[in-house]
Amino acid sequence: MNINLDSAKDTFCKNVLIYGYCKYENKGCAFSHTVKPTSSVPGSQGSNATTNSSGNTNADMKKKFNFNTPSFQPSTVPNLTNKFSNLSPNLKEIPVFVPSGGMSNADSGGMNEPEMNDSVTPNKKFNASTPSFMPSNPYISNNDQISAPSPVMAQSVSTPGAKANGNIQHNPYLPGNAGTPQPTSAVAAPNSADVFFQQPTSSYPLQHHLYAPAPPPRLTIPLPPHEINVNSMFIPNDLRETLLKRNEATLQTLPRSNLPDHVNIYHSLVPIDTSFENISKVYELPSFVYKVFSNVDGNPYALRKIDIQSVLRITNELPFKYIKKWKSVKCANIVQLQEAFTSMAFGGSYSSLIVTYDYFPNSNTLQEQHISRRLGGKLEPITEELLWNYVIEITNALINIHENNLAARSALHLSKILVTNKNRVRLGGVGISDILNYEDDEEQIQQKGLDAFRHELQQADIKKFGKLILDLAALCLPNNARNHEPKDLISLLKTSTTVNFSGEFINLLTELNMNTSDLQEFNRNHLSRRILNFCSNAQDSQDFMESQLSTELENARVFRLITKLNFIIDRPEYDNDPNWQENGNKYIIKLFRDYIFFQYDEFGKPVCDLSRVLTNLNKLDAGIDEKFLLVNKDEKNCIIVSYKEIRDIIDSAFRTLTRG
């Protein structure tokens, strides 16, 4: 491409037009990269009034808007001509808008005729002499009425009289509504002096990263055995973040909701069910789950409300006769049932069935974990090792249930089994089927006998268990291959090239779905060897948690020491105390505080070394005899002192303070 260098220097570079910059600007690009200013030059205030008329005409023709252009006056319509005949084409005669109520008449009168220079006004883009808009006071008016809403009233304003009618109906299940309820709004009544601004309670973001996270393993610098970094002094970031989120979920509240304030001994109801289904597919009745707090012990619980309506009329204690048995079942893989009762607290013409369980914050169901993704979550892939863990844990739960002459029944469903921790599942919703099906169960017991009926229910549990594990394993197959009979699904899992299940696991699926009638025998034949691996992993997890707990064990000791320092330093009553002056014996405490937190490096930047702070505080708390140098801020005075001497001075000052 041939470029004329003489003409190219006056041509604007297209790279700047297209991309905003030219990467060859300083590397030999021949085109121009200088952006020409497009702003017009305003006329000078001291310009000569006798300017050439032709020059003014040309300047006015180049302008897009000309203030000297007269207003449009139609002459063909008589009525409109008379209406607009009084308008003046001169800008200085146009009245200035002054809002009513913004200022007194005396003040606004002087603004109606601002002084303007004819030679200056047409060239100004913005007229500085135009008065600024002053909104009217919403509380003061000549006629004691609010003629127009003020911009201030656009905020969330409510009055005591309108607060009850200002509640906005909102869906408590939508994310963000639980922590951020919609603010109420109402129009302020005339002559009302009690208007106040109601701030909505919004959920604040959790400060998970209180310190810098650990770098990826591939970027981690190997350290000698005698060196450690800051991250090794605290629990891992993922574990800390998980615990913080659980704590936040436990303490979450929902103010100004339509839910009842109290249900029996429980209060502070917060919806935690994320299924968005009013009718439960398991119970075939409206069912909702809430997090509540107990008035008795103050602990959080999960409250399930079932609208039994006319399906079941509970008039006595007979439907709850198995609740006492369920409360006695203690198993690590079962969500503990607390109590069951009926209540009219939710309104309506029928009472609701209320069943409360232990609460596990931020727990997912197996359906949310692997099938239907929860809002903001990710689906966990199915692996053979994960399924072995599920089989062992659910088998443990079923054995405990069957030994107490009970049956899991509706609890063996993907939407009722909770994943409370990594590879940790618990059967939830136990005991509800015994209440809802009480009348039918009594008829079956009279026909078959109690033992035969219980044995039948327990065999149904085993079949549901096998079907549940098979459905989870079938998630590894394509969608069109999952809707088959159990025998066909097992054959597909065995012959599929995309699934790598071992023969041992295929035999387990076959035995569980075809032949098993006794869980104890199934446990001995198929799970005995796998249980040893499960116990080993559980003990490794226990050792990990214990090691993390040991790293946090001494945090309270350091916190108490920092609290003492802040109690005694910079108190107002010590301003004139000679002991806290530069020559006083307690001035060392201030120097030690500066030595720990107010250090600067050789470049004048603050030193924020957490390991150094912890090291010095640990030495101070231990009271060792190590001596070091303390220097004041102007570096004119210095003192050599030991940690033991400083600790004694701090203890003495704190005792003096507490004695008062």
From Swiss-Prot:
Regions annotated as coiled coil: 529-567
UniProt region (Pseudokinase domain), positions on chain: 252-528
Biased composition range(s): Low complexity: 43-59
GO molecular function: ATP binding; poly(A) binding; zinc ion binding
Location of region: Knob domain: 568-660
Composition bias type Polar residues, residue spans: 150-159
Keywords attached to this entry: ATP-binding, Coiled coil, Cytoplasm, Metal-binding, mRNA processing, Nucleotide-binding, Zinc, Zinc-finger
Start and end residues of each stretch annotated as Disordered: 36-60, 150-186
InterPro entries according to UniProt: Kinase-like_dom_sf, PAN3, Pan3_PK, Znf_CCCH
Residues at which ATP binds: R304, D358, Y359, F360, P361, N362, S363, N364, T365, S415, K416
Domain topic, free-text comment: The N-terminal zinc finger binds to poly(A) RNA. Contains a pseudokinase domain. The protein kinase domain is predicted to be catalytically inactive because some of the residues important for catalytic activity are substituted and it lacks the equivalent of the binding site for a peptide substrate. However, it has retained an ATP-binding site and ATP-binding is required for mRNA degradation, stimulating the activity of the PAN2 nuclease in vitro.
Subunit comment: Homodimer. Forms a heterotrimer with a catalytic subunit PAN2 to form the poly(A)-nuclease (PAN) deadenylation complex. Interacts (via PAM-2 motif) with poly(A)-binding protein PAB1 (via PABC domain), conferring substrate specificity of the enzyme complex.
Functional note: Regulatory subunit of the poly(A)-nuclease (PAN) deadenylation complex, one of two cytoplasmic mRNA deadenylases involved in mRNA turnover. PAN specifically shortens poly(A) tails of RNA and the activity is stimulated by poly(A)-binding protein PAB1. PAN deadenylation is followed by rapid degradation of the shortened mRNA tails by the CCR4-NOT complex. Deadenylated mRNAs are then degraded by two alternative mechanisms, namely exosome-mediated 3'-5' exonucleolytic degradation, or deadenylation-dependent mRNA decaping and subsequent 5'-3' exonucleolytic degradation by XRN1.
Stated name of the protein: PAN2-PAN3 deadenylation complex subunit PAN3
